[in-house]
Amino acid sequence: GEKTKKKIFLKKILDFIAKKNPKSFENNSGINIKTRMDFNRRWGLGSSAILINNLSNYYGLDPFEVSKNVTNSSGADIASTKISKPIIFSNNEKKPYYKEVHFNPPFSKNLLFVYLNKKQSSEKEVEKFKKIRIEDDEIRTISEITNQVLRCKKIDDFNDLIEKHESIISL
């Protein structure tokens, strides 16, 4: 069940940490890991990425490398754990790039987070996404949409840009 999946995932992370940093657990006859979240896990707000980031940092490893080896994540979720503000992210397969950006449009009070109670499996969704061939012109278009969103002053323009973005990336 769900508890078994969590244990397997944690073991996968710890096994990779032990492989990269063999001295990590050498003085421990056993370890006890306790985590706490300030949000409902079912919301899908990056609980796995936060765990990977925190354990990686604790053991002196690069969280992007750990994530790449234990998940099929692009690294955007790891980048999001490092900065508590909006970011832009790209991954050219060599090294993830992320940067904090200013995004506080005049209509920000009209933007909402709506929980639909439809958490998806990140692993499955990433696998599905990786099978799609994305053309270079689509990447350029998405990048331009991102830049327009960051400069956007009107909510109607914002909504149009989000719809345009979704029409490109929707599966």
Named regions from a protein language model:
Residues 42-63:
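DPxDG-like acidic metal-binding loop motif
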